[in-house]
Amino acid sequence: MTDTVPAASRAALSAALRAAFFARAQPFLDARVLAPSDVHAVALTAPRFGEDDVERMLGLAFAARAPRVSHPGVDLAALPRQIDLAVDDDAADTDLPWPEDLAAWAAHTRSSPMVGGPDDALTPFVQQPRRRHPATPLLLTRRMYVEQDRVATALAARASSEMPQRARLDDLDATLARLFPLDAQRQVGSTDGPDGEAARAVRLAATRRLALIVGGPGTGKTFSVTRLLAALLDGGRELSIALAAPTGKAAARMREAIREATDTKAQPLLDVSDEVRARLQALPATTLHRLVGMRPDGSARHTVDNPIPAQLVIVDEVSMVDLTMMRRLLEAVHPEARLVLLGDRDQLASVEAGCVLADLVPSSDHRDGGTTGDAVAAAAGPLAGNTQTFTRSRRFESAPDIALIAACLQSYATRHPDLPPDDPHAALERALEVFAGTRHASQETEPDLRIERLGRPARAGVLTRPTETQLAQLAGPYLGGYAAMLVAALGDATPLEDPRWQRSLLAAFDRYRVLAVHRRGPLGVQQLEQALAQRVRAALEVGRGERTGRRGIDLGEGHWIGRPI
């Protein structure tokens, strides 16, 4: 147990210590790298543990900051190069007073009496060894460590448990041969081809209590899940199913994808009865928060003692699930139920702390499925036998340049045929060359149609503000599509209540997206959104007096189409 400072000494020490600590942290507060809450949390706790070293307290403030910026912990030695200072124009050029020897600072911070090991439950911070970097442990808050430990324990328990024989399909091979007719011509479950991956994914989810089905967009995850559902419902089996995703939009996409995958015209080879097809098309999908039953006070309706009433739980877009929500999900799913997690480790990360899927699944340079190969088993650890990785994306087969850029940016060096095998920096250069139009993928047939360059930065490596011409090009498709359709409808007798018109309007809106690499900075999401919004408002002001100001359509829950601007 850590010795504490007597109350009288603690009172005398606190004022001077707080003043020195806040003075040391002030440049980081001014640059908005640290928040007042990070500093106050350490300042209030330090006297209780006899911590009076300002440099160690600064390191602990960054550990307290980590969950606030979506990380469970921090490597202090690597911190300066990881911090994005472009939170505003002034902070972008700020020279922050980092300790001169970062490695020594990290080691010194870990020696604080406020930092303990995994088994020392009384300390507010924990140092956690890392397999890949054993010399530089992560520094975590105790809460984040406990969340990680509970997730790891729950996953390990579920991964080691197979479905009992009574819960398995009577003739899985025959079912797979029927659901994957192309595979049946070779060998069901074979490893040579994308259809083999799909069949293996279904076999995995049908026989294990935990299945991770991962891969990029268009690789066949939904295709496999639809056939898993068809296999489990085949023959009139009774099965309670819960479908969920982190957001309402993702849940709606999941539901729609399953409906499309079971459409008779779109999937004539899906050999299932009309009853099974109807059940699949009627399956609802909900948000993960609603599935777990989150309450306003932060508690959950479904827990270990009151599990989700479903025998099969499928969660899509798992890359967006944070550490705490994953822990809640694992505790809420019944121990006897199947849990299938779908996602792409390289897609959107969680907003809250912890990128669970990225930690569970090997990086994209491991291209073999989780059920094949010792290399993947070693990389994936105890979940290798519960993971199926999809490797071929049909979505980008007609756009090789885009596929090449994605492969470069995902991990610098993957097994893409157009990438150098062992030089990550060359892979990055290759991506920049494709962006610049000086190089193309070997299968690219329309190189001039894939990428439209909106200008070049004033200096290499410097983020500059977009020009008026660039903003006009970015806003053009929006103003000429969705906005033009909406303005026209508000100014004439278009029947706004017509469902066909509503679908057309929403489809026009869905065709416009501007994606940014950064959240902040001159080319980040926040400033681009503000700049584009100004142009849109200015364009819509033209002719405003000629519009009738019709109220539009109330879609419920505060959502409107056509509300006057």
Where would I find each of the regions flagged by the language model?
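N-terminal accessory nucleic-acid engagement/regulatory domains that precede
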Residues: 3-171, 319
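Conserved phosphate/pyrophosphate-binding and hydrolysis machinery centered on Walker-type P-loop NTPases
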Residues: 31, 35, 69, 141-145, ...
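Short coil/turn segments at secondary-structure boundaries
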Residues: 75-78, 121, 164-171, 193-194, ...
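Conserved hydrophobic/aromatic pocket- or pore-lining residues that grip, position, or stack substrates
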Residues: 151, 205, 247, 287, ...
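Short, conserved phosphate-binding/catalytic loop or strand-edge motifs used
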Residues: 169-179
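N-terminal pre-P-loop "Q-motif" helix
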Residues: 185-207
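ASCE P-loop NTPase helicase motor core
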Residues: 200-202, 208-441
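Conserved helicase motor core of P-loop NTPases
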Residues: 346, 353-564
